Amino acid sequence: MRFHISSHHTPNNCAVHRGDGTPPISDWRARCKEVGVEFVAGGGCNPMHNSFMFVEADDMEKLQTLMQPVIGYWDVVITPVRAM
């Protein structure tokens, strides 16, 4: 099943500026592959700290694993998507 994942964080919660030792995820395509999720498309607006991805996964738990490094720092919305 396909999912749309949108995320937003504040400048203070940006991994680039946080300084808590948590490395930013700069390659979401590789992160998806690492956890067994197919990356379909993605992008973002860095100055606004917004990003999105379309992914395909057979298990919601994989999506939770995918986003785990940013949960608690980012607002993340995962929405199931089907063809219209």
What is the predicted function of each stretch?
Residues M1-M84:
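Conserved, structured core segments of small domains
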